[in-house]
């Protein structure tokens, strides 16, 4: 009996129903709730699992390199990046007929292949890889790192190598290690790779281990570094006629501030990128020496926080008590980490297209669309997770005595003001934005499109002008040709910036108008509503006027029985659950906007977006319907084409999405009755009744069914849009 699943909970292992299985899976990673868990074992388990996570990541990236080297066309792509389609891997499928074999044999391949829309070809090319042998070497190295990570994870579970709790809670040492050791040293190492391998590679010089020590990255070597003449490293940059990967038009500079884009590759100058990483390395190497550890110098974080008491008294006891609150709560730390990572991931989505760093990636439109959408969705899930763990912190780890009248306690004390302000902002944005859209729809429907309310985003245009965009005629700061900022910019810093901002061939500072104004506020509505639900969930997690003892019920509970009416759907988990729908909704609007705007930009008919994006029917007809036409014809009675797999995935995504509603709309009692009927039929059916079960079948709990519904809704939603995005973009641009 003791060996039944789950072994981490004897109470659950003895449950006679199928609840044992589902609750076991649901709580498998909730280490805090396991039998016999101690704080020390909790920290050690999480620490060891990090190495397993790293091993999986290294194995996965190794697989990418290996499959491209084995089945891809990297060497052919390198010869002509703009016209050869990069191959991710081969496809073998016994169901393929001759039309499918022909449709999927692309990129110069002999048989069916998948085209890579991940941008890895451009990345590998930019950082200096040129041959399949390079890819195999990288795959082997990452495989080696994966094995090392697994060994390290196993090692740190052995008694002799298990770190103590005090080691885990040594915040200063950890910060120093992460800032200097991880960010600082890795940025410096990456600068080294760019300067020694990637930049020579972009100039037609093949640097590998055999000649690494013989090839000077700069004609003057380390001389300028030691003599303080650092500006010599910026002299003689690549010319505007430079052909990437060759010596034609190349220079000798290694660290520059050119600004703008390489004219041929449409990506940032590699020498600018190296300079950026060197600066980052310097900042983090210094930052990693700020905190007091072994030598008695530097800051103590606890002292810093204890001293943060604003003299005006408006923030009470300021940051007193926060050090121990944060340092003793893994949920608080995870919440902070997820919030930071979520913001960074969204910034990555934004910057990968507006300031492309990889050679020729800006001209690979499908890859640009896929990467933007991918990173925005990931950012959404990570950010909602941050609030989820913030709420769990308030329920499990928050100590009111320890935080009396500090900034954290004061957040809880005036939560009504915070929540009601967010509610007011959401209502204002929602009614006004929808009102404008609907008004415009009515005007078009009644044949008077000239009566639409079209608002120019003059403040945003002014900001773009201040950064150098001249087309609006604002004549301010960098767009003012006789101003000091403009003149300094032409020589001292980023001379290429102004020409890049005013080029219409890139995505830097797109020209904006009334359609952008409206969708911007629609997105603002989504962001504020998502935030409202998440913030309310966290701030009400310990209790509310309706349910003051809420924290005693834990993070996820359906209701407090029939005796307390109105306690359903108010757990912190329910807030997270509702917020994910709004998050998906918001990112849908963000990606629709980005994609439609860019399709018209790439096709050279931006006026279609400008004219149709000011009313809802325009979005439905001229974006969704118009761009799904190729998808809907991916296969039909007359045959199929290379979009057929996306057409099928589009259909399948809708199916998964719709399945979600089955769990979201019908609740536990319906399923319980159905299960009991099915069990009755099973037990009375010959042959079938030879199969018995130990656990009595019961329906999922309300919370679990909601999770299953949410998972189907999310996965189906994203699958559907991914298929639409890739097919509609690749169908137009190849």
Curated annotation (Swiss-Prot):
Molecular functions per Gene Ontology: 4 iron, 4 sulfur cluster binding; chlorophyll binding; electron transfer activity; magnesium ion binding; oxidoreductase activity
Keyword Transmembrane belongs to the record: yes
Binding site for chlorophyll a B3: 662, 670
Enzyme Commission no: 1.97.1.12
One cellular-component annotation, GO: chloroplast thylakoid membrane
Amino-acid positions noted as binding chlorophyll a B1 in the UniProt annotation, renumbered to this chain: 654
Catalytic activity: reduced [plastocyanin] + hnu + oxidized [2Fe-2S]-[ferredoxin] = oxidized [plastocyanin] + reduced [2Fe-2S]-[ferredoxin]
Swiss-Prot/TrEMBL GO biological process terms: photosynthesis
EC class name: oxidoreductase
Membrane-spanning residues: 46-69, 135-158, 175-199, 273-291, 330-353, 369-395, 417-439, 517-535, 575-596, 643-665, 707-727
Localisation: Plastid, Chloroplast thylakoid membrane
Keyword Cytoplasm: no
InterPro entries according to UniProt: PSI_PsaA/B, PSI_PsaA/B_CS, PSI_PsaA/B_sf, PSI_PsaB
Residues bound to phylloquinone: 671
Record membrane topology: Multi-pass membrane protein
Cofactor binding comment, as recorded: P700 is a chlorophyll a/chlorophyll a' dimer, A0 is one or more chlorophyll a, A1 is one or both phylloquinones and FX is a shared 4Fe-4S iron-sulfur center.
Alphabetized UniProt keyword annotations: 4Fe-4S, Chlorophyll, Chloroplast, Chromophore, Electron transport, Iron, Iron-sulfur, Magnesium, Membrane, Metal-binding, Oxidoreductase, Photosynthesis, Photosystem I, Plastid, Thylakoid, Transmembrane, Transmembrane helix, Transport
Residues reported to bind [4Fe-4S] cluster: 559, 568
Top-rank lineage group of the source organism: Eukaryota
NCBIfam families reported for this sequence: psaB
Purpose of the protein: PsaA and PsaB bind P700, the primary electron donor of photosystem I (PSI), as well as the electron acceptors A0, A1 and FX. PSI is a plastocyanin-ferredoxin oxidoreductase, converting photonic excitation into a charge separation, which transfers an electron from the donor P700 chlorophyll pair to the spectroscopically characterized acceptors A0, A1, FX, FA and FB in turn. Oxidized P700 is reduced on the lumenal side of the thylakoid membrane by plastocyanin.
Family in the record: Belongs to the PsaA/PsaB family.
Assembly with partners or alone: The PsaA/B heterodimer binds the P700 chlorophyll special pair and subsequent electron acceptors. PSI consists of a core antenna complex that captures photons, and an electron transfer chain that converts photonic excitation into a charge separation. The eukaryotic PSI reaction center is composed of at least 11 subunits.
UniProt-recorded name of the protein: Photosystem I P700 chlorophyll a apoprotein A2
């Amino acid at each position: 009996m003791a060996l039944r699943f789950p072994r981490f909970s004897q109470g659950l292992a003895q449950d006679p129903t199928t609840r044992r299985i589902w609750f076991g899976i649901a709580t498998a990673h909730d280490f805090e709730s396991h039998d016999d868990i101690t704080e020390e074992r909790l920290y050690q388990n999480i620490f060891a699992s990090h190495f397993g996570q790293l091993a999986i990541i290294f194995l996965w990236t190794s697989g990418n390199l290996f499959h491209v080297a084995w089945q891809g066309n990297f060497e052919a792509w390198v010869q002509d990046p703009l016209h050869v389609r990069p191959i991710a891997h081969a496809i073998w499928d016994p169901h393929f007929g001759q039309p499918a074999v022909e449709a999927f044999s692309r990129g110069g391949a002999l048989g069916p292949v998948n085209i890579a829309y991940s941008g890895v070809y451009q990345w590998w090319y930019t950082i200096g890889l040129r041959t399949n042998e390079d890819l195999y070497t990288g795959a082997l190295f990452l495989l080696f790192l994966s094995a090392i990570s697994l060994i390290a994870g196993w090692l740190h579970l052995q008694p002799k190598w298990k770190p103590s709790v005090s080691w885990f809670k040594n915040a200063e040492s950890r910060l120093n290690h992460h800032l200097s050791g991880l960010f600082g040293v890795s940025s410096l190492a990456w600068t080294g790779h760019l300067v020694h391998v990637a930049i020579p590679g972009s100039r037609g010089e093949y640097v590998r281990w055999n000649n690494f020590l013989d090839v000077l990255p700069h004609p003057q070597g380390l001389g300028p570094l030691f003599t303080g003449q650092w500006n010599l490293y910026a002299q003689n940059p690549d010319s505007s006629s430079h052909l990437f990967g060759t010596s034609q038009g190349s220079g000798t500079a290694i660290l520059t501030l050119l600004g703008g884009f390489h004219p041929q590759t449409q990506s940032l100058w590699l020498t600018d990128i190296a300079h950026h990483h060197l600066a980052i390395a310097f900042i983090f190497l210094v930052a990693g020496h700020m905190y007091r550890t072994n030598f008695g110098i530097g800051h103590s974080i606890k002292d810093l926080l204890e001293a943060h008491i604003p003299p005006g008294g408006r923030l009470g006891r300021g940051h007193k008590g926060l050090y121990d609150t944060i340092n003793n709560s893994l949920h608080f730390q995870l919440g902070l980490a997820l919030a930071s990572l979520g913001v960074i991931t969204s910034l990555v989505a934004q910057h990968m297209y507006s300031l492309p760093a990889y050679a020729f990636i800006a001209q690979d439109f499908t890859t640009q669309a896929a990467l933007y959408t991918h990173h925005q969705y990931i950012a959404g899930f990570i950010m909602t997770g941050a609030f989820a763990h913030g709420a769990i912190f308030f329920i499990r780890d928050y100590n009111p005595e320890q935080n009396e009248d500090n900034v954290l306690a004061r957040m809880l004390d005036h939560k009504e003001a915070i929540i009601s302000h967010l509610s007011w902002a959401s209502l204002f944005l929602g009614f006004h934005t929808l009102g404008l859209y609907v008004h415009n729809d009515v005007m078009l429907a009644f044949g008077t499109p000239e009566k639409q309310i079209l608002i120019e985003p003059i403040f945003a245009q002014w900001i773009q002008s201040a950064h150098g965009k001249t087309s609006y005629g604002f004549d301010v700061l960098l767009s003012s040709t006789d101003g000091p900022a403009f003149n300094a910019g032409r020589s001292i810093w980023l001379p290429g910036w102004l020409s890049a901002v005013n080029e219409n061939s890139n995505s830097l500072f797109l020209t904006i108008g009334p359609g952008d104004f409206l969708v911007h506020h629609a997105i603002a509505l989504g962001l504020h509503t998502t935030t409202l639900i998440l913030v309310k969930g966290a701030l009400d997690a310990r209790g509310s006027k309706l349910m003051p003892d809420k924290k005693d019920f834990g993070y996820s509970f359906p209701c407090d029985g029939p005796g307390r009416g109105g306690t359903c759907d108010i757990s912190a988990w329910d807030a997270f659950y509702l917020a994910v729908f709004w998050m998906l909704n918001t990112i849908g609007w963000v990606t629709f906007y980005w994609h439609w705007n860019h399709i018209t930009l790439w096709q050279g008919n931006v006026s279609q977006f400008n004219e149709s994006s000011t009313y809802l029917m325009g979005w439905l007809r001229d974006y969704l319907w118009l761009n799904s036409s190729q998808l809907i014809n991916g296969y039909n009675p007359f045959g199929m084409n290379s979009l057929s797999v996306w057409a099928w995935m589009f259909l399948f995504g809708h199916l998964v999405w719709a399945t979600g509603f089955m769990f979201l709309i019908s609740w536990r009692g319906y399923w319980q009755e159905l299960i009991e009927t099915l069990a009755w039929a099973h037990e009375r059916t010959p042959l079938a009744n030879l199969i018995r079960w130990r656990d009595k079948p019961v329906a999922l709990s309300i919370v679990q069914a909601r999770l299953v519904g949410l998972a189907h809704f999310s996965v189906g939603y994203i699958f559907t849009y991914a298929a639409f995005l890739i097919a509609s973009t690749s169908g137009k641009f190849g």
